[in-house]
């Protein structure tokens, strides 16, 4: 075959490795000389196919080798050519021919044929391109089926996973870099010369087979040809992977291998199932791969499934590795990132959807990490009563919440905190009490099924150990003043000794320590133990820095806020509806008009924790009213200022963790600069906002102006948006290591330019310049006709129909040095950027955090102002009462409406008037009436008005005059907890007991149909007992008691502060089947339930309706006769003068017919 036009006579190319079978002479493994030893009589070529008929490119390491673009498979003539041709050697140079001949004489025919086949398979892959992997895929499927019994990997799973179009990857037959290094290291002993590796293979080892055959043999566990052993022989890479798995048990590892991210072993099987990707055997381990650019997407999916995911990176760079003494050993790999659902920190480019899977549907807030510690209360009469300490961290926002509380058998207090804090991961001690275990299991589920991930700690430290661990953590970070003595570690010290020491430190902390240390040493004991567990856990994720900022700490229990328990959140549909379990139709859906992510998160905190401080409530209401009216020009600009802001709270958190990119840093600083420039402190006198709260937060925005501009002036915004860390800083002297690396690269660039002048002279082309193709730089491109003029020592990289591209030896040498300087520059730039962000957060975090917090507050106030503009909303008027006075809270609401129903319902809502604990009304209402008459709707509207008023919102009423409540307790509905072993009645009674144990005279209590979960007799007795208990308290709370037990109405005679009321209706007949008309208005007195009417409307069969009506009439007559008999008996048992009409009326009222 004639040589191609671009090939110089005597110049080597890939075509020279082929020869027809008829003219082929026997060859040996050592038939090819080392490239470094080839004389100048032979030009060097790349490993890819030279062609003049189409574009072809080659990527030199560290770039990945490209393949031929064979979309329709190899052409027929190419396949025919492969069947006719075999490999033969280039003629070696004279100086090595004698050595090669000697080695050839020592090779056996079997070794020669095996080596020929290995070379044949390698070049066949190069010729056929990606379609060569098809046959291997078929064999891989057979191997997976064979290994399924050992790995529990079913055939159906593998078949399903290969159907994924987005993430399923074609198996690449290219050897991994580490595997190539393994083969080179194994063959770098005296022996014959190998054409493909450039190294000699030992004569004592068998001839190497193709990668395909080697993979299959190792996967099936077949012994080597030499019979050295019967078990699997692990490569250095596989040994490294097994060591990593042993070091990190329970972690699903994603390992960087070359330019790929891979799962191995059982992790590959799990990833194949969870991600719907292909799993295939590779040597001794199952393997699955994902694209590098979709790492964050797949990590999210895995952690949402409840897995703990680790990312193992190569910490050595290619250029520096090649220049080191360990060039032929595996890359050093370490766990560089660890993720769970609670520790995942999204970047600013991700969509801010708080209702997505990474948030919680119950509270629509970011998931948190919670540590729970409990301790039995000694000396308590109830053996199952415990003290519980918790610490919860939201890593996306930096908020850290702590609390310690006493809880009963039902663990309702723990349930309330879980509902508010919405943990995605919970750390618990090795053992908990059975009631606590049941509550956690019922509420949090199983992480493996997509629920909350529960991690049980190996051991729980006592207070002594926890205190020493926490104080050491803060002392090591320089957060403790030198005057504060170090906590000694006394092996025999008791918990009481450490407690006394902690108390001593706390007493003097205000004068000698930072505010953070003062807070830490004053934490409750169980909370401190939980904090120690949180810090230790976060250190593995490199997120512990969030615990070093005092502004992030807050107590869950506060005297200035109202605590809504989990039942109230569910029954009043605060965050989600009861039926659809969606946000639409909930209170948060009605109020959320925020424009920023920070504002939406803060609004949820306001709604879940209404204020009890009347002065703060007045401040909020003044601000909402001012924003609603919009009289000030400053207030009218707020809406445009807040529009389009990124999630600055999350951005600051990423900066604190050291995970922010230059683009995110620029985004945060530019957004803060735009906000702080909008309001100037020296113009505050002209704002006239009529709200001290708004003025305070506007001044807070202005206070961050100088800080933001200082750091903005140090960086280049253009380079930051391009994520260019090397050219990010305007002052090059700030980070000299960067400039030194740049200078070294500039020297190499100068030598490359000087070498280019030499090439121009050699080729007589004054305008010649380097070109870059497919990621390969510094290519010398010449026309095909001139290709024969280039020196033979140039390396031919790629060719097209018209052009041929080369690398000169000097270019390759200088490129290697330049790559080393480039990687040094990248490392220096990374360290400089981390230092820049670290110093920014250390010195100015509080200022920037205050600016972001003020933006969130203004956003929430604007949202409430938008709600206040709706028709029929009024500003609530709070009635002041002495804080220490034991008195019921007055409530007077005129024209009260259900704020949500009037929006979602097509029918107009009927308003009602409610008054409690006022001069003309008592503290309790006994509410009866028809089924579907609107009883539950009225009490829900009452609860919503109180909550909306105490978060600082206008309310849906004509007039609202209320006092400040410290809690709203709502018990409604019937439900069981089968998985926790609690029946409907047990749940009902337990929730009622929790309310009775927590209420005060300043609480609002709403009980709906108590006692329905058992027999009528027992239910009536329970309802009567609970109602009487509430009425006989020294200072009874405001109570609305819904019931169908009309006998309870008699209590009004004994307790004047109880009023009987019902939902009105109209009816023209006493026939149970005649229609009634519901009025939906509150009226004094009692009323029947009309349950048979409701059953008739529900379309029960008429036969059942008639039967029920007959039974009801009989029971009514029987009870009426018994009541009349009791009246007459009482009348004749007393003197005639007492048997007056009033006495008869009293007796009839005491025993009314039901």
UniProtKB/Swiss-Prot annotation:
GO molecular function, one term: mismatched DNA binding
Residues where ATP binds: 929-936
SUPFAM superfamilies tied to this protein: DNA repair protein MutS, domain I, DNA repair protein MutS, domain II, DNA repair protein MutS, domain III, P-loop containing nucleoside triphosphate hydrolases
Start-end of Basic and acidic residues biased regions: 69-83
Compositionally biased region (Polar residues): 21-60, 183-195
Region (Mispair-binding domain): 228-342
Pfam family, one: MutS_I
Membership in a protein family: Belongs to the DNA mismatch repair MutS family. MSH3 subfamily.
Role noted for this protein: Component of the post-replicative DNA mismatch repair system (MMR). Heterodimerizes with MSH2 to form MutS beta, which binds to DNA mismatches thereby initiating DNA repair. MSH3 provides substrate-binding and substrate specificity to the complex. When bound, the MutS beta heterodimer bends the DNA helix and shields approximately 20 base pairs. Acts mainly to repair insertion-deletion loops (IDLs) from 2 to 13 nucleotides in size, but can also repair base-base and single insertion-deletion mismatches that occur during replication.
Protein name: DNA mismatch repair protein MSH3
């Amino acid at each position: 075959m004639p040589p191609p036009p671009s090939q110089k006579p005597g110049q080597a190319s890939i075509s020279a490795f082929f020869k027809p079978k008829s003219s082929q002479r026997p060859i040996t493994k050592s038939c090819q000389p080392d490239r470094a030893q080839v004389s100048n009589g032979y030009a060097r070529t790349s490993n890819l196919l030279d062609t003049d008929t189409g574009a072809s490119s080659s990527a030199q390491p560290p770039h990945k080798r490209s393949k031929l673009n064979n979309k329709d498979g190899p052409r027929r003539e190419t396949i025919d050519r492969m069947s006719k041709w075999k490999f033969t050697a280039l003629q070696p140079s004279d100086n090595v021919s004698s050595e090669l001949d000697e080695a050839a004489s020592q090779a056996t025919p079997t070794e020669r044929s095996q080596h020929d086949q290995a070379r044949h398979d390698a070049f066949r892959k190069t010729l056929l391109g990606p379609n060569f992997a098809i046959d291997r895929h078929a064999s891989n499927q057979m191997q997976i089926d064979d290994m399924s019994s050992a790995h529990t990997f079913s055939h159906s799973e593998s078949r399903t996973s290969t159907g994924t179009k987005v993430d399923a990857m074609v198996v690449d037959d290219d050897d991994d870099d580490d595997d190539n290094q393994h083969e080179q290291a194994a063959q770098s002993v005296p022996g014959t010369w190998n054409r493909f590796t450039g190294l000699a293979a030992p004569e004592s080892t068998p001839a190497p087979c193709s990668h395909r055959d080697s993979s299959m043999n190792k996967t099936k566990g077949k012994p080597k040809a030499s019979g050295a052993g019967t078990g699997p022989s692990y490569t250095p890479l596989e040994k490294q992977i097994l060591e990593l798995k042993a070091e990190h048990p329970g972690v699903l590892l994603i390992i960087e291998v070359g330019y790929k991210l891979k799962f191995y072993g059982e992790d590959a099987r799990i990833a194949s199932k969870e991600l719907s990707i292909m799993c295939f055997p590779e040597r001794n381990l199952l393997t699955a791969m994902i694209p590098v650019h979709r790492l964050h997407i797949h990590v999210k999916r895995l952690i949402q499934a409840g897995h703990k995911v680790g990312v193992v990176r190569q910490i050595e760079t290619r250029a520096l590795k090649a220049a080191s003494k360990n060039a032929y050993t595996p890359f050093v790999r370490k766990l560089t990132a660890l993720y769970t659902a609670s520790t995942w920190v999204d970047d600013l480019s991700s969509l801010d959807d708080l209702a997505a899977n990474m948030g919680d549907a119950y509270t629509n807030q970011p998931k948190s990490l919670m540590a729970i510690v409990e301790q039995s209360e000694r000396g308590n009469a109830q053996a199952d009563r415990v003290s519980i300490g918790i610490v919860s961290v939201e890593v996306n926002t930096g908020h850290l919440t702590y609390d310690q509380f006493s809880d009963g058998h039902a663990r309702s207090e723990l349930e309330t905190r879980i509902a508010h804090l919405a943990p995605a991961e919970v750390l618990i001690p090795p053992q908990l009490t059975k009631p606590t275990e049941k509550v956690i299991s019922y509420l949090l589920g199983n992480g493996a099924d997509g629920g909350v991930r529960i991690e049980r700690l190996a051991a729980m430290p006592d207070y002594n150990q926890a205190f020493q661990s926490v104080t050491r953590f803060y002392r090591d970070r320089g957060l403790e003043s030198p005057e504060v003595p170090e906590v000694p570690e006394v092996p025999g010290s008791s918990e009481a000794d450490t407690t006394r020491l902690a108390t001593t430190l706390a007493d003097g902390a205000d004068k000698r320590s930072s505010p953070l240390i003062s807070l830490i040493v004053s934490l409750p004991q169980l909370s401190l133990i939980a904090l120690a567990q949180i810090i230790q856990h976060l250190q593995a994720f490199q997120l512990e820095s969030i615990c070093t900022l005092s502004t992030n700490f807050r107590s869950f229990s506060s005297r200035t806020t109202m605590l809504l328990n989990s039942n109230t959140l569910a029954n009043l549909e605060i965050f989600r509806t009861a039926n659809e379990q969606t946000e639409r139709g909930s209170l948060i859906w009605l109020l959320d008009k925020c424009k920023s992510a920070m504002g939406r998160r803060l609004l949820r905190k306001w709604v879940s924790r209404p204020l009890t401080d009347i002065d703060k409530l007045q401040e909020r209401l003044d601000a909402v009213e001012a924003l609603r009216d919009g009289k000030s020009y400053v207030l009218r600009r707020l809406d445009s200022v807040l529009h389009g802001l990124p999630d600055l709270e999350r951005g600051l958190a990423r900066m604190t963790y050291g995970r922010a990119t230059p683009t995110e840093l620029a985004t945060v600083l530019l957004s803060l600069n735009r906000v702080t420039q909008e309001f100037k402190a020296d113009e505050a006198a002209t704002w006239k906002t009529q709200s001290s709260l708004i003025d305070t937060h506007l001044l807070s925005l202005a206070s961050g102006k100088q800080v933001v501009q200082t750091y903005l002036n140090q960086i280049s915004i253009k380079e930051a948006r391009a994520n260019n860390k090397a050219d990010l800083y305007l002052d090059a002297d700030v980070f000299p290591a960067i400039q030194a690396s740049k200078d070294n690269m500039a020297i190499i660039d100068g030598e490359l330019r000087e070498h280019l002048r030499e090439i121009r002279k050699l080729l007589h082309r004054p305008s010649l310049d380097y070109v870059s193709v497919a990621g390969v730089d510094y290519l010398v491109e010449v026309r095909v006709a001139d290709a024969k003029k280039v020196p033979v020592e140039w390396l031919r990289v790629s060719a097209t129909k018209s052009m041929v591209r080369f690398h000169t030896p000097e270019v390759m040498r200088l490129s290697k040095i330049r790559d080393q300087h480039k990687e040094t520059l990248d490392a220096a730039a990374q360290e400089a950027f981390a230092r820049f962000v670290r110093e920014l957060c250390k010195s100015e975090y509080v200022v920037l955090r205050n600016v972001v917090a003020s933006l969130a507050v203004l956003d929430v106030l604007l949202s409430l102002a938008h709600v206040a503009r709706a028709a029929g909303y009024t500003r609530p008027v709070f009635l002041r009462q002495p804080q220490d006075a034991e008195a019921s809270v007055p409530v007077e609401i005129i024209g009260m409406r259900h704020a949500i129903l009037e929006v979602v319902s097509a029918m107009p809502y009927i308003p009602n008037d409610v008054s409690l604990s006022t001069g003309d009304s008592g503290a309790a209402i006994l509410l009866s009436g028809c089924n579907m008459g609107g009883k539950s709707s009225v009490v829900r509207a009452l609860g919503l008005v109180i909550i909306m008023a105490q978060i600082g919102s206008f309310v849906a009423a004509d007039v609202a005059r209320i006092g400040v409540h410290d809690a709203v307790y709502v018990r409604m509905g019937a439900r069981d907890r089968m998985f926790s072993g609690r029946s409907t009645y047990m749940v009902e009674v337990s929730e009622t007991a929790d309310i009775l144990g927590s209420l005060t005279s300043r609480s609002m209590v709403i009980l709906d149909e108590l006692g329905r979960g058992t027999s009528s007799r027992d239910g009536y007795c329970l309802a009567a007992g609970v109602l009487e208990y509430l009425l006989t308290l020294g200072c009874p709370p405001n109570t609305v008691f819904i019931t169908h037990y009309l006998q309870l109405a008699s209590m009004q005679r004994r307790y004047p502060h109880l009023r009987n009321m019902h939902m009105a209706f109209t009816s023209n007949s006493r026939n149970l089947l005649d229609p009634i008309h519901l009025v939906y208005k509150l009226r004094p007195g009692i009323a029947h339930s009309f349950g048979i009417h409701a059953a008739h409307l529900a379309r029960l069969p008429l036969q059942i309706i008639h039967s029920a009506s007959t039974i009801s009439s009989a029971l009514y007559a029987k009870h009426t006769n018994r009541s009349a008999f009791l009246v007459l008996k009482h009348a004749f048992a007393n003197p005639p003068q007492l048997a007056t009409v009033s006495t008869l009326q009293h007796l009839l009222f005491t025993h009314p017919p039901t």
